[in-house]
């Protein structure tokens, strides 16, 4: 095991393709550290590139689905799955995006009791149901998102973001990825 916690060897950064080395440099510049998700996923460099391209597309804010909403979905799914890495990392990102560490913490622990408005409650309920009980997701669940003010495209994004984090949670948990310590101090109340 290494400092990422991964059960797999983490490649030396110098051995990675140039596009990933540039991505790592940008992450360090923006965050002040290199997230372990990049280090661990670099075990399969081409897949990391594809995963990150998809991640970036899904995290583009829209009129009714903000960056904070998108991080909130990641947190709700990660909490439902018990994914340590993603819950810590996206919990930190949610606190930053909300500009409200208290609300971010409440959502991370129990979105139902966080004092969310009806739109955000509908988003969280959908993401959690798709995670915990996918076989029973139906048209009514989708309609709840639309009734909450999301466009069909934004409802699609809720579905796709939840699906991506279900995948990512399983990869992070399966590899034994540990969150960077730096996340713990970000945007705390």
Question: Residues of each region from the PLM?
Answer:
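Hydrophobic alpha-helical segments
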Residues: 1-189
């Amino acid at each position: 095991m290494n400092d990422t916690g991964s059960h797999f060897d983490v490649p030396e950064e110098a051995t990675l393709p140039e596009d990933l080395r540039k991505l790592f440099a940008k992450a360090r510049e923006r965050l002040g550290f290199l997230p372990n998700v990049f280090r661990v996923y670099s075990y399969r460099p081409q897949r990391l590139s594809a995963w990150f391209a998809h991640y970036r597309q899904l995290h583009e804010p829209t009129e009714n689905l903000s960056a904070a909403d998108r991080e909130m979905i990641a947190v709700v799914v990660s909490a439902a799955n018990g994914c340590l890495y993603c819950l810590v990392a996206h919990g930190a990102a949610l606190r930053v995006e909300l500009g409200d560490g208290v609300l971010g913490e409440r959502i991370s622990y129990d979105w139902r009791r966080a004092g969310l408005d009806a739109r955000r409650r509908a988003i969280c309920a959908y993401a959690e149901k798709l995670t915990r009980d996918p076989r029973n997701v139906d048209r009514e669940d989708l309609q709840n998102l639309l009734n909450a003010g999301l466009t069909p495209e934004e409802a699609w994004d809720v579905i796709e973001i939840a699906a991506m984090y279900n995948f990512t949670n399983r990869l992070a948990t399966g590899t034994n990825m540990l969150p960077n310590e730096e996340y713990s101090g970000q945007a705390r109340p």
